[in-house]
Amino acid sequence: MTGLNPETECLVEIAAVITDFDLNVLDEGIDLVIKPREGTVEAMGDYVRKMHTDSGLINEFNSGIDLADAEAQVLEYIKKYIPNAKTAPLAGNTIGTDRMFISKYMPALDEHLHYRNIDVSTIKELSKRWYPRAYFQAPKKDGGHRALADILESIEELKYYRKSVFVEGTGPSIEEAQALADSIKTDKL
């Protein structure tokens, strides 16, 4: 993205990776650079410009593909593994902004994705509060703010939290789960 506002900024890179339920990556994924709209690169803020310069992405803008072509390729890639609409969640780290950009600029892709998201940053924040030992030992990230590297690091991070924070096995029995649910009362205001 050239910034965080989908009304004035644009997508400049998109990637996707499909995993199975155990977070095993099924193939190398897809990673595309999108040619920015005229004027958006010049209008980028200093922070974003430095980030895209340091990562090398800014040097790839001119050879990027059209936004519609990028949407079609990503959608084709996802449908190869998940042909049914509304079943594939968007997943990654701090993906609220990603979802807004996809909704605005890639409506067919947005329509194919499930409305629910899997945001690793939520798990990270809960772990920081409830399981700080696990949080502070989490794998360090160094994706350099490139889409595919960020996705792969998010998958590794989610694998880590799954093993270090979430209950191993199938979880509580139905009876235990029901007893837990019955024991939790929300304070009334």
Map each language-model feature to its residues.
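Short, well-ordered beta-to-alpha junction loops that form the rim of enzyme active sites
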Residues: A91-G96
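Active-site-proximal helix-loop-helix substrate-binding element of RNase H-like nuclease domains
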Residues: K35-T40, Y47-V48, V120-L152
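Catalytic phosphate/metal-binding cores of nucleic-acid and nucleotide-processing enzymes, i.e., regions
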Residues: F21, S103, E125-W130, I174-A177, ...
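Acidic two-metal-ion nuclease catalytic site recognized across multiple nuclease folds
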Residues: K141, H145-L189
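Substrate-recognition/cap helix-loop segment adjacent to the acidic, metal-dependent catalytic center
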Residues: K80-I82, T97-R116
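Acidic active-site catalytic centers that drive phospho-/nucleotidyl reactions
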Residues: E13, D20, D98, D119, ...
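Conserved non-catalytic scaffold segment of RNase H-like nuclease domains
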Residues: M1-L90, P139, D187-L189
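Short conserved catalytic/interaction loops centered on acidic-Pro-aromatic/His motifs
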Residues: D110-H114, A134-A138, F166-G171
